[in-house]
Every structure is written in C-alpha cells, then in structure tokens.
C-alpha cells in the first residue's frame, strides 16, 4: 500500500513542502489548468511531475505523482454528441502522454452535467478534522432551483 495525499496543484494552500511531512510518498493531483477536452501535453505532465519530485520525503526518497485525479471526460463524450470523437482522441493522447511519463494510475469522474460535486468542502468530523461531503438533498435543490431541471429526484 502506498500512502498518498490529494494536492490541488501549485495554487493549493497546502504546499508540497508541508505535505511531505505527513508520512506520505505519493501525490494525487491533476492538471486542472488544462481545459476540459484538451490534450495533456507530455511537457505539462513532465513539468508537474518534476515539481512534485523536487520535494524529498527523506534523504533518499522523493515525493512522486502516484495518481491522476482526474483526467476530465468532456461532456460531449458523456453524451456521445458534438465533437465526441475529437475529444476521445484528445483523451487517448493524454493517457499516452501520462504513460510516457510513467504515470499509470488514472482516475476519472464520469458524473453527468457537473464533473465534480461535493456539497460541503469543509465538513467538520467529530474529531475536529475536515472532509469533503456530498449531500444528495442539496444536489436536488441545486438541480431544481438553480438549474431548473425537471428530472431532479431523490433516488
């Protein structure tokens, strides 16, 4: 088992310098700066990987980019409409570029409409720590009152 930690990239208030102190070896991250549907270039991947690897966990071991979270799936692919074939090719090229950089553990999020939904980004647990939380009732309210969806239901 490898201990990893989610890092939201260079703009994350949690810095790699601090994260490396919590007993992890791997970083779970993405290239959130790349537009959905656009290819992740080998150069961009290499640059992010080098940034992560520039931090040592100890004298002989560096942090590593262990997991991609997430390589976004464009909505045209999800709906099989529009330029979905183009976006599939871009996605495949991104996978190849990740593999060329020896990053092979790739998560994706196939949520329709909104790619990444959490209803509370600072939910306090009983021990005082914070976690991300999903509340389906809040999502239904969002669908009904913000998106004005006719299909929102409590499942």
Briefly describe each language-model feature range.
Residues 30-47:
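Glycine-rich, proline-tolerant flexible connector loops at the mouths of alpha/beta enzymes
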Residues 9-21, 48, 86-97:
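Short, acidic/polar
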Residues 19-34:
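Basic, amphipathic N-terminal segments that precede the first structured/catalytic domain
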Residues 46-68, 91, 129-134:
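Alpha-helix-loop-beta-strand connector modules within alpha/beta enzyme cores
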Residues 1-9, 49-50, 73-75, 79-83:
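Mobile, glycine- and charge-enriched loop segments
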Residues 6-10, 30-34, 70-73, 110-113:
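Active-site beta-loop-alpha junctions enriched in small/polar residues
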Residues 77-155:
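Active-site acidic/histidine proton-transfer and metal-coordination neighborhood
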Residues 3-6, 25-29, 63-69, 98, ...:
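Hydrophobic faces of well-ordered beta-strands that scaffold small-molecule active sites
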